[in-house]
Amino acid sequence: MEFEMNRFPVAKLITALGLTMLSAHAQTPSPSADPAANNPDAAKTQFPLAAPAGEDSGAISIAPPAAVNQGPLDPAKWKYGPAYDSQPDSGIWNPVMIKMMKGEKVTGGTVLSTDTPATYCAMANAGYDFIWTEMQHDPRDWDSVGRMWKACPHAKAVPGVRVAYTDEREIQHAMDLGALVIVVPTVRSVEEGKAARDWTMYPPLGKRSLGAGQAFEPEMWGNVPGGYRNTINKNVVLIEMIETVEGVKDAREIAAIPGVAAIFAASGDLGNFSGYKMGTPDYERLINIVHDAAIGAGKRLCGPFLWRDRPDFTCFQNATEVTAIQRGVADELGPLKDTQGKPEVGPYAPRK
């Protein structure tokens, strides 16, 4: 009975001790992943140049003593920093740019209607210098293009594309997916030409945003010498198409835009927009003006493969994957082409 009587005070004591320990534990702050929670000077040590909390730093007018750009902030006078300079030993790693710099002829095979990686890769390994993935006249989406390019990024032909229009979203989709040749259609003015250049090139030459994309992946260009961000401006081939009379008038200024590698005399649309057919004096005059603009600016001159022997033309658009298949079969079969049997009845019988 004595034990039973003393048991309750002991239990009360244990309960009281437990509550005291819990209270003490609750009042002791746990370690935090936030360094500022355990180090009151963390902001000063990690961000020594940061503005004081809750105060106007005056940075719009006064720069830190070690800053290159002193005085009031003026974008027009801003000296671009060296963070993204390409190293002298990084070299040119785009085979198309290498050939164009030498003045050699380059050809682009057109992928018009397929979104199948196997067909794209067959074209990319057929012998062209680049693939002209058609996005102006085909309704495929950019996801399809990305899958095709990623299926064989280091094929013989580098991935290229004709975008639909001079637009930040359109061109940056192409660049972020890994395009090494950008063809811009229907450039009507110097302003449009500069806009196309701006969305293709990173600063300081252009205005391309530094985003993510498969272009940065190791399977694509993530491991190129010097790094993708620092070297793509001197590797991407930008071709601007002259397709209208207005574009022809501004062709010299368009060709002279820094970053434009070539201008393209669009054989079909120059006829479409001028009303004259190839070979007529008015048509040929327009082509010759584009020719003069390219050689005057020291840029390459592009056109259809039909013009591969025309003076000073060195880069060309070839036919589509469908035409390439037809040509390949014709070359392979020779005299056996179109020698199918001719039944007199049934779906294969000649129509009467």
Predicted regions and their residues:
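Conserved, mostly hydrophobic/aromatic
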Residues: 109, 134, 182, 196, ...
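Alpha-helix-loop-beta-strand connector modules within alpha/beta enzyme cores
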Residues: 142-168, 172, 200-205, 231-233, ...
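N-terminal amphipathic alpha-helix/helix-capping segment at the start of soluble metabolic enzymes
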Residues: 60-110, 222-234
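Catalytic cores of alpha/beta
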Residues: 166-180, 184, 191-193, 248-257, ...
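Glycine-rich phosphate-binding active-site loops on the catalytic face of alpha/beta enzymes
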Residues: 181-192, 263-273, 314-333
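C-terminal helical cap(s) of enzyme catalytic domains, especially alpha/beta-barrels
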Residues: 148, 191-205, 322-346
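Active-site mouth loops of central-metabolism enzymes
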Residues: 102-117, 160-164, 236-249
